[in-house]
């Protein structure tokens, strides 16, 4: 039966993020990003609709943001602030995670994140009722990234002001920048392989002109059969 973490258990969860950061660096990654979006645990702590706690991790925006700050602090201890970023998704509503006062919540959070001198703040594009990008820009003293549903043209218009992020398109097109430069067609990501085991959907997407065989499936150039 699901239950809320006891207050004394929360520090051990932050330590799990610390260990994950250490392992990522040992594996050769340049940096780490805290996924505090899409209804995952950090956003569940942050959002008033899911956080019903009455201890120091619940109630006010400051308390609800405490878990995120403590996790980031643990990650920074391992990687340094210049190699640690965060992704947030105001009002995405994914996994039914909602907040009664998102502007107040995210205003406090972004101000607090700026104090940590993170490598960047990654904003997921959402259909929010308020302009969260306009809210974040003057409050965050660092690079601001925007991602989600972008293509070459929409990303180009953003790069002059901030930075653009590609996720699933990069997964499906390991040579994405070269394809953009050449105006070449793009492979569509196979969503049925997301969060699955094995190499399919991870390392079997070809670059232009390349053919890869995985099992009995032949993947070609800019079109997946």
Language-model features and meaning:
Residues 1-225:
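Flavin-dependent oxidoreductase catalytic cores
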